[in-house]
Amino acid sequence: MSFLRPTLALLAVTALVTTSGQLNGYSKKEVTPEDTELLQKAQSNVSAYNSDVTSRICYLKVDSLETQVVSGENYKFHVSGCSVNSDKELGGCANQNCESSKYDIVIYSQSWTNTLKVTSITPAN
């Protein structure tokens, strides 16, 4: 019977990790330099945009981040940013004095296939 204790403890921890902090499948995450680098890499590369993503913005700062584990990972960046007129202006804003708004940028990453896609850019609610 004592061999069941570690197994039950592992199951309890797994259930806790699986269910904790999930709202619509997303969990809040502290923004790391690696997360910001991922945002910059995807958001500044127009070929990484899904064809239905027509918004073009630069970002001033990352306000917060949520992640969702799927067949890879979805990153929902809540950013302050500005509309831009050309793909050359994507990524971090060169003009720090632009008229900013709040946006949500969702990036899908699957590291084992080197997939990095901007799946949506929407005005934040």
Curated annotation (Swiss-Prot):
<keyword id="KW-0789">Thiol protease inhibitor</keyword>
<feature type="signal peptide">
    <location>
        <begin position="1"/>
        <end position="21"/>
    </location>
</feature>
<comment type="function">
    <text>Secreted effector that interacts with and inhibits the pathogenesis-related papain-like cysteine proteases C14, PIP1 and RCR3 of host plants. Inhibition of host proteases by a pathogen extracellular protease inhibitor forms a specific type of defense-counterdefense mechanism between plants and microbial pathogens.</text>
</comment>
<comment type="subunit">
    <text>Interacts with the host papain-like cysteine protease PIP1. Interacts with the host papain-like cysteine protease RCR3. Interacts with the host papain-like cysteine protease C14.</text>
</comment>
<dbReference type="GO" id="GO:0004869">
    <property type="term" value="F:cysteine-type endopeptidase inhibitor activity"/>
</dbReference>
<protein>
    <recommendedName>
        <fullName>Cystatin-like cysteine protease inhibitor EPIC2B</fullName>
    </recommendedName>
</protein>
<keyword id="KW-0646">Protease inhibitor</keyword>
<dbReference type="GO" id="GO:0005576">
    <property type="term" value="C:extracellular region"/>
</dbReference>
<keyword id="KW-0843">Virulence</keyword>
<dbReference type="InterPro" id="IPR046350">
    <property type="entry name" value="Cystatin_sf"/>
</dbReference>
<feature type="glycosylation site" description="N-linked (GlcNAc...) asparagine">
    <location>
        <position position="45"/>
    </location>
</feature>
<comment type="similarity">
    <text>Belongs to the cystatin family.</text>
</comment>
<feature type="site" description="Reactive site">
    <location>
        <position position="25"/>
    </location>
</feature>
<feature type="short sequence motif" description="Secondary area of contact">
    <location>
        <begin position="68"/>
        <end position="72"/>
    </location>
</feature>
<dbReference type="InterPro" id="IPR000010">
    <property type="entry name" value="Cystatin_dom"/>
</dbReference>
<keyword id="KW-0732">Signal</keyword>
<keyword id="KW-0325">Glycoprotein</keyword>
<keyword id="KW-0964">Secreted</keyword>
